[in-house]
Amino acid sequence: MVVRTQNSESKIKEFFEFCKENEVEFVDFRFSDIKGTWNHIAYSFGALTHDMFKEGIPFDASSFKGWQGIEHSDMILTPDLVRYFIDPFSADVSAVVFCDVYDVYKNQPYEKCPRSIAKKALKHLRDLGLGDVAYFGAENEFFIFDSIKIKDASNSQYYEVDSEEGEWNRDKSFENGVNFGHRPGKQGGYMPVPPTDTMMDIRTEIVKVLNQVGLETFVVHHEVAQAQGEVGVKFGDLVEAADNVQKLKYVVKMVAHLNGKTATFMPKPLYGDNGSGMHTHVSIWKNNENLFGGETYKGLSEFALYFLGGVLRHARGLAAFTNASTNSYKRLIPGYEAPSILTYSASNRSASVRIPYGISKNSARFEFRFPDSSSNPYLAFGAILMAGIDGIKNKMDPGEAMDINLFKLTLDEIREKGIKQMPHTLRRSLEEMLADKQYLKEGQVFSEEFIQAYQSLKFHSEVFPWESKPHPFEFITTYSC
């Protein structure tokens, strides 16, 4: 038997007992591809053996973009019994197990497996002696629409989303003949009570289901945009936090679906309204001590500021992982509480990095406000950690904090102050990443092979098609030329 997992005999025994106690009929093995899509393969419980949790489960990796060619398609899923749960949506009782991907040709964890990359980033932090754990906490915003229509043909390009909350429905006659008229309006949706908030019951249902699958929630509310919401979940270590993002997205989409609606974590689905981010909180701990707490700006340590310096230094290329879609850059524009200016401040939501208010050293952390949920959380969190590590190693100065409303600065003022901005396109962020990738490759965390596979996937599946397709707005500006 070839042992490819770190599952102990006691862990395997514990899992089988869990399945028997819960009368599990199927075990659903789930893994994330490069883009961040959660995929699965299910086995009936009676077909499982203990050896499968040691040796792994074979699958065809050539069916996933950016992974293997058909001539070397065999890969192995390695179950990780650190984390599993009962799927609250399956008709038959199913246990969900997180998996990594193992390379049978090199006899090692697959270098293009996002979850394995996240684990390597955490290991790199420990190997350098810089910390025992990196805690991450994500705030994933989302939209819940009543319906969506999309067309992508050679002679027609359009989309249409709809929501009872939409200001475009003020004059609509609904099927019941009633239009109640209570709507938040553009940028008016932050925390109103019902009936303006039509999604309260769906959000509370989401919270209940999240608790069932082991996610501790602490806040739930309507967000600024029409049809937008947020559910806050407790932080965890880097890998756990990324696992939690996958859980959260699955639950939100499924609860919406079962309520006859459709949920999206797309960064900017509505023109003229706020977009959805994935604000990411980070701190590093060693010997049960928060290394970010100290005596410098707003209770931060010098160690923390160096970490921040690394993230700000590499942010333009880092965006290839944290803002991983062409749509991401329609969110990162002034005027919609989206942080496009690369600086930091305390309690200032116009900065790309915020230092949240805290009453103790243990609460010292950064909130990186530029990431969004189109990213693969394993890659986004791993890349943020690698940038911060580079900042610590090389003592990168983040510069002075800017405690002003940055949205009011003109482009000339931004240039005069020497402040960098986030890239304006996915193409530019990928180009910046390719020109600034050495810090990612330290400790063999992000391999050159993975980086090339990632950029190729993004260029061919998103950048090139987006650049080559006529846009409806171009017909307004150019058709009569």
Curated annotation (Swiss-Prot):
Mg(2+) 1 binds at residues 139, 279, 367. Residues 22-106 form the GS beta-grasp domain. It catalyses: L-glutamate + NH4(+) + ATP = L-glutamine + ADP + phosphate + H(+). Its EC number is 6.3.1.2. Gene3D superfamilies: Glutamine synthetase, N-terminal domain, Glutamine synthetase/guanido kinase, catalytic domain. GO terms for cellular component: cytoplasm; membrane. The activity of this enzyme could be controlled by adenylation under conditions of abundant glutamine. One of its GO terms (molecular function) is metal ion binding. Its cofactor is Mg(2+). InterPro entries: Gln_synt_N (IPR008147), Gln_synt_N_sf (IPR036651), Gln_synth/guanido_kin_cat_dom (IPR014746), Gln_synth_cat_dom (IPR008146), Gln_synth_gly_rich_site (IPR027303), Gln_synth_I (IPR004809). Residues 114-481 form the GS catalytic domain. Keywords: ATP-binding, Cytoplasm, Ligase, Magnesium, Metal-binding, Nucleotide-binding. It comes from the Bacteria. ATP binds at residues 281-283, 349, 354. Mg(2+) 2 binds at residues 141, 223, 230. GO terms for biological process: glutamine biosynthetic process; nitrogen utilization. It is found in: Cytoplasm. Binds 2 Mg(2+) ions per subunit. L-glutamate binds at residues 274-275, 331, 337, 349, 369. Coiled coil: none annotated. The keyword RNA-binding does not apply. Catalyzes the ATP-dependent biosynthesis of glutamine from glutamate and ammonia. Oligomer of 12 subunits arranged in the form of two hexameric ring. Belongs to the glutamine synthetase family. This is Glutamine synthetase. It comes from Helicobacter pylori (strain J99 / ATCC 700824) (Campylobacter pylori J99). The lineage of its organism: Bacteria, Pseudomonadati, Campylobacterota, Epsilonproteobacteria, Campylobacterales.
